[in-house]
């Protein structure tokens, strides 16, 4: 049975990355995106938009995680910028899915809220890292 979209929550159970709130939030969000993709494919028979949001929504966390292993501060900032761009794309797809009635307002609002929170944290992290470069 496919999880209902309002249940797109993933609980992490303590690992080495737990100290980094951004990584934790992007893992949780990525898991919600995977569940959303499954819902869209299995319940709504939607394959095109679901693939788009799966790619952008899971790429956010992948780039944040990769940034932790950057060769330099500039590399770290560049990876966070990529994650920020993926966040903007994911926000776009969530709005399209809502406007096209694949997601109801409550589902879209919950996921958009998480997406925008990650976006704010990324912007703050990028600004802090840039200030540290000066």
Which ranges hold each PLM region?
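Short, C-terminally biased terminal segments at protein or domain edges
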Residues: 1-62, 66, 70-134
């Amino acid at each position: 049975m496919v999880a209902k979209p309002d249940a797109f929550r993933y609980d992490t159970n303590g690992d080495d990355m737990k100290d980094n709130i951004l990584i934790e939030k992007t893992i949780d969000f990525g898991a919600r995106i995977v569940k959303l993709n499954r819902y869209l494919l299995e319940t709504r028979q939607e394959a095109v938009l679901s693939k788009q949001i799966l790619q952008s929504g899971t790429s956010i966390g992948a780039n944040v995680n990769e940034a932790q292993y950057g060769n330099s501060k500039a590399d770290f900032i560049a990876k966070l910028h990529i994650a920020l761009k993926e966040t903007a794309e994911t926000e776009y797809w969530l709005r399209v899915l809502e406007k096209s009635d694949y997601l109801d307002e409550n589902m879209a609002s919950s996921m958009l809220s998480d997406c925008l929170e990650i976006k704010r944290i990324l912007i703050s992290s990028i600004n802090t890292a840039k200030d540290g470069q000066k």
